[in-house]
A protein has these predicted regions:
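Acidic-aromatic/histidine active-site loop/patch
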Residues: 219
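Acidic/polar loop patches that form or flank catalytic/metal-binding clefts of enzymes
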Residues: 212, 223-229
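Nucleotide/pyrophosphate-binding catalytic subdomain
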Residues: 1-216, 385-386, 405, 411-418
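Short hydrophobic alpha-helical runs that function as membrane-insertion/retention elements
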Residues: 168-172, 226-228, 291, 372-373
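Short phosphate-binding/catalytic loops that engage adenosine nucleotides
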Residues: 34, 90, 224, 288, ...
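A conserved regulatory-domain signal marking ACT and ACT-like small-molecule sensing domains
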Residues: 237-418
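Terminal amphipathic helices with adjacent charged low-complexity linkers/tails
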Residues: 40-48, 179, 228-246, 301-302, ...
Length: 418
């Protein structure tokens, strides 16, 4: 008897008919002789609706109270799924994050899983019950309700699978796997049978809507192999697992794009120790996530720093940098640029193959697309381009690496589903 963890997002449980479909799928899995644990998100639109109500009451709602409020969304959906299962004759029980033994730490609305006590879940499973667990939530050691932030239900599913030593973990969504690129941008993108943790992490940090990176990090840390697949059919999806030697045969696993980026360039920085720390420290204190960072020294001995961020953080970054720039001297100034996007090519085969950057840059040049910034890691090459050209850029690079020609040519994109 296998123990299977299945995660269903908000779209999958967005209506009562969809809840019945989820229950029917869980019943089929159980009837096949398996133990089943479902991890469920709030119904589609519920979380946003709760946030809207809170902000209508107050411009700055307490994050503690937001956690208490938002946790009710998942409690609604798990109860409804359990009821649907019971109507089908199954012995099902819903449990909250607290009852599941998910202990968290960190800030309210952005909790991190600290540890787990799966004893209650094990007891229910030993009694033959099917479990429906609330995603997105846990409890602090001192008893406060915590939500896990964006992608929290995926993280819950991975953590539950690790704690219970599940045989299978499935992330079920409304598309059928991970693709070489967003099929809405590249129509000939292909579904991948598998992808490594490291490639998935790079894709997650580069704009791919597959999963949040911390869910993949958690899976890698605890060795949880999981599958991204459709909740609408039984077709195989995409396995996410530790890399193996055959994976290096594919140079590029896939292409990701990230829109709504902005670039900040600081010029005239004294070339002295500690300058970078002061600048980036101010950005960090403002809780702004930076992406690409490029530094160089001008002939006059003054440094130049450029970095990218989400365009929504641009105003906050300018405010945070204002006092720092004033301290750097009369030559220092800040320039900003919006309307850019990031294109990334990812693949562990880069470690053992040369010429990847040349192929990518030639493809962009042939398409008449100018490159702004360039950033590389061991398994990723990323560039910025004009945001209006990002889709054309993605298609050009996708074609240049032939990602449409083999089902093993790449990784990529999947819709976020709660």
């Amino acid at each position: 008897m296998a123990l299977i963890v299945q995660k269903y997002g908000g779209t999958s449980v967005g209506t009562l008919d969809r809840i019945r479909n989820v229950a029917a799928r869980l019943k089929r899995t159980r009837d096949a002789g398996n133990q089943v644990v479902a991890v469920v998100s709030a119904m589609s639109g519920i979380t946003d609706g709760l946030i809207k109500m809170a902000r209508e009451l107050t411009e700055n709602p307490s994050e503690r109270e937001l956690d208490v409020l938002l946790a009710t969304g998942e409690q609604q959906s798990i109860a409804l799924v359990a009821m649907a299962l019971q109507e089908m004759g199954m012995d099902a029980v819903s449990i909250t994050g607290r009852q599941a033994g998910i202990f968290t730490t960190g800030s309210h609305t952005r909790g991190r899983i600290l540890n787990m006590d799966p004893s209650l879940m094990r007891g229910f499973l030993d009694d033959g019950k099917t479990l429906v667990v609330a995603g997105f939530q846990g409890i602090t050691p001192n008893g406060m309700i915590h939500t896990l932030g964006r992608g929290g239900s995926d993280l819950t599913a991975i953590a539950v699978a690790a704690a219970l030593k599940a045989d299978v973990c499935q992330i079920l969504t409304d598309v059928d796997g991970v693709y070489t690129c967003d099929p809405r941008v590249v129509p000939n993108a292909r579904k991948l049978p598998e992808i490594s943790y490291d490639e998935m992490l790079e894709m997650a940090s580069s704009g791919s809507k597959v999963m949040q990176s911390r869910s993949v990090e958690f899976a890698k840390k605890f060795g949880v192999i999981f599958e991204v697949r459709s909740s609408l059919n039984d077709n195989p999806g995409t396995l996410v697992l530790e890399e193996h030697p055959n994976m290096e045969n594919v140079v590029i696993r896939g292409i990701s794009i990230e829109r709504s980026q902005a670039r900040v360039t600081i010029t005239g920085i004294p070339d002295e120790p500690g300058m970078s720390g002061r600048i980036l420290g101010a950005i960090g204190e403002a809780e702004i996530n930076l992406d690409m960072i490029v530094s160089n020294i001008a002939p006059a001995g003054l440094a130049r720093h450029s970095f990218t961020m989400h365009s929504s953080d641009l105003g906050k970054a300018q405010a945070a940098l204002k006092p720092v720039i004033a301290e750097l001297g009369p030559n220092a100034k800040v320039e900003t640029e919006g309307g850019i996007a990031k294109l990334s090519a990812v693949g562990i085969g880069m470690r053992s193959h040369s010429g990847v950057a040349a192929t990518m840059f030639k493809a962009l040049g042939a398409a008449g697309i100018n490159i702004g910034m360039i950033s590389t890691s061991e398994i990723k090459i990323a560039v910025t381009v004009d945001e209006t050209l990002i889709e054309e850029a993605a298609r050009a690079v996708h074609d240049a690496f032939g990602l449409d020609r083999s089902p093993q040519s790449g990784i990529g994109w999947v819709a976020q589903d709660g």
